[in-house]
Regions:
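Short, conserved active-site loops that position catalytic residues or coordinate cofactors/metal ions
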Residues: 24-41, 70-73, 233-234, 266-283, ...
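Active-site catalytic loop in hydrolytic enzyme cores
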Residues: 78-84, 131-163, 328-417
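A conserved mid-to-late transmembrane alpha helix and its immediate loop/hinge
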Residues: 160-165, 315-316, 412, 460, ...
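Soluble catalytic regions of membrane-associated enzymes that act on cell-envelope
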Residues: 213-363, 398-402, 408, 412
Length: 547
């Protein structure tokens, strides 16, 4: 086998990171994802075949170059909101990704099965992506399947698999191409039949999903069930305005003259962005809220049958005998309260309905592992509004008072496919995404977040109305097409009709079944590998003692 020098491996690690970065939305070319992991696979194979010449954790060290470059190039924009948060997210996420590669090398070394060795890494990787969704350091922005977010014609089959199907697709093609390239590097003779088999496999794996997806995209017809929606984009600067303007000034921006000219009695829903109402509202005292009162008066005057959905910072007092959770904050010597990032559902007459954001941003909306580090919660990064560990909703709330059942997904929650599908399983026929992306300024961050909503539309076959404080606000149909959008960092109001849907997709019904399956297989692989490792260590020790 041709042995590459260590400097060549470093170059390969850099190449893999560059290819992953250049594939990423919004300006990237996603086809590059199909070759982006080949350099990394070559590195892993080189280390595996020449393990005696490499230091411990060599797989981790080389792959860390790849993932640090990729994470930095695609999520650098976090720096605009928090320097510490950016460094933490980039460094730790790169370490976790590299750890996956290192664990795969450990398993390969113990299992000593060539065929199994090749497929261990994608199995572990998909398991990592799946498990990374549901812990305190969750950061799923760079799930590989997200790479196709701006090219939804290729991935209409996400309605069956979700983004983990895209991750699997990328890994399979990379591995098949790696077989060919590795045979060249290894100077192995491949029979014509074997080479043709690999080429056919690559063609089948790439072409069949692509053709089916394009056909599905071209032939998908939405059942007519139009819902009239207005999106408000007040463009409040989160650094200088949103948390400093008076309630009256915020309401004047939100319910602008343009909004008043566009909204009439035919509008079904009016949607405002995340955290736009920062009045310090206690949830048992909404009747005293100036913001809620003004919205109700606005509805009565302009559109009495409409329903108003808006983000807000709200609070709830704990009852005297109520157990205190990790989000509890001291109000005074005897009373406790908790804060929420809330979606308010308001009509012209009844009390507002609330949904509390449940996928919280680590370090901003919750301190990771708060049960262990409650004393240092005051270090939570302050981005305005409510900070520290926030309270959550245990249920995926569906609002039934309007013409169709709807749900509001708050900001970061829209990145989680299975999470969003739970609202649909609970009855939502439309999804509203309310967000405030102004923290990241005019970078790739808000654009990536915008196109990720297109993936949720395909997965659930739900039309999406997205209200973003500074943009991009938009309407997305059930195929994932953006049918109308605003410009970034402008004050605007747009109105359109999108179709509600009652059908449940395979993905909505079964969720991330690929990730669950891979996690079970990974657990088995790691367990067997540990047993083999310990058995070998015992035998080695016995052999040494016998001598």
């Amino acid at each position: 086998m041709l042995e590459l020098k260590k400097k060549h491996l470093i170059l390969l690690a850099i190449l893999s990171g560059l290819l992953l970065s250049l594939a990423w939305p919004l300006r990237g070319f996603p086809f590059l994802a199909f070759i982006s992991l080949i350099p990394l696979l070559i590195i892993v194979e080189q280390i595996q075949q020449n393990s005696s010449k490499f230091l411990l954790f060599a797989s981790f060290r080389y792959s860390y170059i790849t993932f640090l470059l990729w994470n930095t190039a695609t999520t650098y924009w976090i720096w605009n909101s928090t320097e510490f948060g950016a460094l933490f997210a980039i460094i730790v996420n790169s370490m976790l990704m590299s750890l996956v590669v290192q664990v795969s090398s450990f398993i390969r070394q113990n299992m000593k099965n060539q065929i199994l060795g090749i497929i261990i890494l994608p199995i572990l990787w998909i398991s990592f992506e799946f498990l990374h969704q549901d812990w305190d350091l969750s950061w799923t922005w760079l799930t590989l399947g997200n790479v196709f977010a701006s090219h939804i014609q290729w991935i209409q089959w996400y309605e069956f698999t979700g983004v983990h199907g895209g991750t699997l697709w990328i890994w399979i093609i990379n591995i098949l191409l790696f077989f060919i390239i590795n045979s060249i590097i290894s100077k192995k003779e491949i029979c014509k039949a074997g080479r043709n088999s690999v080429i056919i496999a690559i063609s089948v794996v790439f072409i069949i999903p692509s053709i089916w997806s394009i056909w599905r995209y071209k032939t998908y017809d939405e059942k007519p069930n139009p819902v009239d929606i207005v999106l408000l984009q007040p463009n409040l600067n989160p650094y200088t305005e949103e948390y400093k303007l008076s309630v009256d000034e915020v309401m004047e921006r939100l319910l602008s003259s343009k909004a008043r000219s566009i909204i009439d009695t035919n509008v079904d829903f009016i949607v405002a962005p995340e955290s736009v109402l920062q009045e310090g509202m206690f949830e048992d005292e909404f009747c005293y809220s100036i913001s809620v009162r003004e919205i109700k008066e606005f509805l009565k005057e302009y559109s009495p049958k409409s329903h108003f959905i808006s983000g807000a910072g709200t609070f709830r007092m704990f009852k005297p005998d109520e157990p205190l959770g990790p989000s509890a904050r001291r109000y005074n010597s005897t009373m406790w309260y908790e804060a929420f990032n809330t979606a308010l559902f308001i009509d012209s007459s009844g009390a507002p309905v609330t949904y509390h954001k449940s996928k919280l941003v680590a370090g901003v909306e919750q301190m990771p592992f708060v049960h262990l580090i409650k004393p240092i919660e005051k270090l939570a990064i302050d981005l305005g509004g409510t900070v520290g560990t926030l309270g959550k909703s245990n249920d995926r709330t569906v609002y039934y008072k309007g013409v169709v059942p709807v749900s509001a997904v708050i900001c970061y929650e829209s990145v989680y496919g299975e999470f969003v599908s739970e609202f649909v399983k609970n009855g939502a026929q439309l999804i509203f995404v309310i967000t405030n992306d102004g923290w990241w300024k005019n970078t790739a961050g808000h654009k990536q977040h915008f196109v990720y909503s297109r993936l949720r539309a395909v997965e659930t076959r739900r039309s999406i109305a997205r209200a973003a404080n500074t943009g991009i606000s938009c309407f997305i149909n059930q195929r994932g097409d953006v049918i109308q959008s605003t410009e970034y960092w402008t004050q605007d109001v747009i109105r359109n009709k999108i179709n509600a849907n009652t059908e449940i997709t395979f993905y909505t019904k079964h969720g991330d079944f690929i990730g669950r399956g891979m996690s079970v297989v990974s657990l088995l692989l790691i367990s067997v590998s540990m047993v083999v490792y310990l058995f070998n260590r015992i035998n080695h020790r016995k052999t040494r003692l016998s001598k």
